[in-house]
Amino acid sequence: MSKISKIILICVLTFSHSYASEIIHIKHQDGDIAYTVRQAIENAKDKDIELVFEKGTYTFLTKYALSKYLYVTNHGNGFKKIIFNFNGFNSVVVNGNGSQFIFRGQTAPFVFEGCKKIEVKNVTLDWDIPFSFQGDVVAVNKKEHWYELKPYTKGFSWKLVRKRIEFPGINNFNFSNLGSSLPHNKKTKAVDYGAWDRSLKSNFVEEKANGVLRFYQYDLKKFPRVGSVLQSKGDKKNNRYAPAFLVRNSKDIVFDNVVIHHALGMGFLFERSENIKILNSGVYIREGSDRVMSIVADATHFANCKGDILIENCRFEGMYDDGTNVHGTYVEVDKIIDSKTVRVALKHNQQYGFEFAEEGDEVWFIKAPSPTRKETNTVTKVKVINDHYTDLTFKNDIATDLKSGDVLENKTWNPSFTMRGNTIRDHRARNIIIKTPKKIVIENNNLSSMMSSIMLRGETFYWFESGNVEEVIIKNNHFKDCAYSGSEHAVLKVSPRLGAAFSSTDLYDRNIVFENNTIETFDSRIVWADRVDGLVIKNNTIKQTHTFKPLYPNAFMFDLINCSNVKITNNTYKGTVTKGVQADATSKKTLLVKKNKGFKN
């Protein structure tokens, strides 16, 4: 390090020691501070570190960021530019003191790996230029296969080059096409009523008068509404670069008063981590901004975590995927190596490189056609073949009826989950999608969703996210105008998505209670359940609204398929829907419906 660099670093950083940690005070400065922070972390003498920022607005560029190849679940793998890299610390505290952290370009702002205690508090994250393209829809001609936009320019970055849009043009990166796109209500910024997910790849773009662009796409089936704001986040291959916060193989984690206005993937992503709290925090668009998207994927995401997870008093809005997704991972049996060893495969390309198990983990064996968890066995050896295949050796002999195409699920890494007192609305996809066999409590939340508000869905198909639930309590929530996209959903939807080798009738999820909720809805469907054993729907108040025209007016309020032991009691409905309960022959055998008001049993 040069003498000048040393002097600058000393001016920006001051060091002190408390009883437990090395405290690094970071004074405010203008310009790029990324390398200063990197040096502070890398030169820390203790394994207990606290970064304390003087309140201010800080800029983080990628020129001198750490470059590291990362496998990131549900994102694109590759070299990532990391600003805050914490690896192997006993404890880490980051205190922003109300600061704003502004990033530019493809960046993984925070990565925590192998840390025993983490606390991040009092900080807001944003990007100076969002990785998005949006414009007001001013005209549509379905017959001629075009729509016209007046693109936003202030605060956005894009160019029209050779009759195609290039964006964002930051650090020589552009998406290959407009990609994943949705129309939004210009006033509320919510996804537009009746909207469908669409992937936009224009054949060509014409420049018209007054800053208007005409987009031709000959295979487009669903056109945006004139007056809406059409927003695009880029092609699927590149539009999940990294989460704002990546935490893996860590424990005892607290985020408090942390707000994310933009990120190039998820907001908070946790892999194989234990005991997590997200408190008084948020993912939402900055006040006064004309952006209609906050972050490009889930607000929060938990993959193969354990211990207790709590999300409380948070606000999640504007993201382009779920409010939260909690799941394990199914791996598929590729080959039986010997009596104790099996080769397994990660099946989704955004799972490649994920650590499914380590020595000492207990694993369930699930053998088609039944989706039921069968015997357990303990892993004694893990041999990674590559990012796709791994050999697992077990303590006991593998069952002789295990075969290629069956799946394994990690028993050790499953969390209990509580979501309390949050507001989740005005975003793509579902408020909550969750799959864990341990206790789930969802209470006192304000929820409004494009798709189903709450979805319980394990799947041995596509994402291969495990697994079936065994104890769920959904109570005292306020649901407002949920499932307003074009596709058919419900307030609560339970729908396993299993591969062709698995039974489509065997019971999958169990012991779900949906009680004391207030539901204000423009449409009919409240609960849509498939293959549930033990579903209680009681003491809910349902009120019809006239916010939108019903999308599926012929749907039943409660729709049951291949279910067992369902009780629908003491619910009250006020509105004009007359179709109350629909149940197939299997569900009717053990169905109890009584003491409801306002709809037919």
Outline where the language-model segments fall.
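Ser/Thr/Gly-rich low-complexity blocks that favor extended beta-strand/coil architectures
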Residues: 103, 127-129, 138, 152-206, ...
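Small/polar beta-strand repeat architecture
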Residues: 186-240, 373-417, 425-426
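The right-handed parallel beta-helix/beta-solenoid scaffold, focusing on the short coil/turn
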Residues: 49, 56, 82, 90-92, ...
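Short glycine/acidic-rich loop motifs that flank beta-strands on beta-rich extracellular proteins
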Residues: 62, 103-109, 129-133, 242-244, ...
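Extracellular beta-strand solenoid repeats
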Residues: 52, 59, 85, 93-95, ...
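Acidic Gly/Asp/Thr-rich repetitive segments characteristic of extracellular carbohydrate-active
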Residues: 24-51
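Extracellular beta-strand-rich solenoid/capping regions of secreted or surface-exposed proteins
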Residues: 38-43, 60-93, 102-121, 129-146, ...
